[in-house]
């Protein structure tokens, strides 16, 4: 049975912490960031890449696309132009793991990226399943309603954060909605905006 994208995300996040083939548990790496002048530094970039077992250039390109900025790899860290929030990196990391690391069939991280007739696929070395990588639009191409504090709007919950809040996206903004589930459409009120992160209150 073909799973919906929401079901795939649920399988990805429920699979985090499950034993790998070696018997070790996969632990979602935590981004360690700090502001340095007009830039944001991801201090443990190399550690995250090693933990995910992915190519550093592929991971870096993904982050740059999600943040809509420029940056560079500097030794074991990565530097991004602009000031960004911890919540943004947490959401980006969760999205990357769901799309490019966790098997949607067995929920394990024992996977690798392969090309099959020019199509990028995620091949699971644990259960043997293979699926195409979901194409994502660059954030600069995504348009949405204007975001401002106090505004009410309807959003689609794409995934669930590590803290249990629903994650939605409107244009360049990441919205957190407490008390929701992946796949839901809910009406919310914007309570606070910090950079490209918006905090909301669900309207009952």
Swiss-Prot record:
Q: Name one GO molecular function term.
A: translation initiation factor activity
Domain TRAM span(s) in chain numbering: 146-204
Q: Which InterPro entries match?
A: IF2/IF5, NA-bd_OB-fold, TIF2_bsu_arc, TRAM_dom, Transl_init_fac_IF2/IF5_dom, Transl_init_fac_IF2/IF5_N, Transl_init_fac_IF2/IF5_Zn-bd
One Pfam assignment: TRAM
For this protein, the record's PROSITE patterns field holds: TRAM
Q: Which SUPFAM superfamilies match?
A: Nucleic acid-binding proteins, Translation initiation factor 2 beta, aIF2beta, N-terminal domain, Zinc-binding domain of translation initiation factor 2 beta
What keywords are annotated for this sequence in UniProt? Initiation factor, Protein biosynthesis
Family statement: Belongs to the eIF-2-beta/eIF-5 family.
Q: How does it assemble?
A: Heterotrimer composed of an alpha, a beta and a gamma chain.
What this chain does, per the entry, is described as: eIF-2 functions in the early steps of protein synthesis by forming a ternary complex with GTP and initiator tRNA.
How is this protein named in the record? Translation initiation factor 2 subunit beta
**Organism of this sequence:** Methanocorpusculum labreanum (strain ATCC 43576 / DSM 4855 / Z)
């Amino acid at each position: 049975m073909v799973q919906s994208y929401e079901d795939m995300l649920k399988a990805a996040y429920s699979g985090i912490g499950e034993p790998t083939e070696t018997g070790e548990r996969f632990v979602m790496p935590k981004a360690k960031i700090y502001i340095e002048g007009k830039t944001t530094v991801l201090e443990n970039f190399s550690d995250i890449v090693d933990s995910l077992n992915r190519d550093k250039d592929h991971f870096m390109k993904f982050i740059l696309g999600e943040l809509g900025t420029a940056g560079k790899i500097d030794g074991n860290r990565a530097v991004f132009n602009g000031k960004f929030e911890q919540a943004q990196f947490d959401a980006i990391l969760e999205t990357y793991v769901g799309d490019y690391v966790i098997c949607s069939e067995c929920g394990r991280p024992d996977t690798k990226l392969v090309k099959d007739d020019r199509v990028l696929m995620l091949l699971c070395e644990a259960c043997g399943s293979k699926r195409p990588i979901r194409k994502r639009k660059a954030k600069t191409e995504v348009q949405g309603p204007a975001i401002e504090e106090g505004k009410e709007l309807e959003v689609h919950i794409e995934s669930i954060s590590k803290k249990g809040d629903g994650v939605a996206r409107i244009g360049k903004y990441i919205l957190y909605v407490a008390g929701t589930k992946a796949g839901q459409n809910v009406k919310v009120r914007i309570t606070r905006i910090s950079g490209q992160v918006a905090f909301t209150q669900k309207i009952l």
